[in-house]
């Protein structure tokens, strides 16, 4: 159930402070019968998964998890593509004790756009999202944006004002309805399992949406168009069948997407081959 699923996300370049806070929040959530969801990446993700796996179940909750796993990792590629490679052992441990999840077919490579898709899945699976460390522009903020759109609660851990690793956290607290989280109890309370917290924006309930990142030329693409665009090489043009395999889409769909991308200046045809525009 979503009310027992807490997503914990943040920077790949986590500080010792960020890893410590993450471990405390993740372990407490699992001890109270919740599941910790993250993306399997380095930094905050890895710290969240490890703490969830190592957390001893509280005696009164050990027999009452109702099949809720301690942790779930959402992958950007296929389930047979352990990424990052340095986390293969960790991801196998997550698979043994919890779940690995992906909406990509086996063999699909993790690409930039698929990481953004993964963030959407993390937000959708969770009842609430906790952002521990995030830079000014980060995937964690992207996950928070999806969570706001889905009506999920978002909590943010503040950091030193001098730390670039917390700049995105402070931005969320200033510009969005995110809630300030300073203890593991407040993190769990995002799921409705504890006392109410003060809102962001100085403790007031904010009506502002999550901060928007600067627009990219690809921001308006459909999912299929984005997959085709990701499959296009930057320099060496490739035949359509290669693009079809990389994108994991049917040939007619790829051809239609290539035509639209070409009109938008995002794809270039070189004889019977294609590359990015």
What are these regions (language model features)?
Residues 1-277:
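Glycine-biased, small-residue-rich flexible motifs in mid-sequence functional cores and linkers
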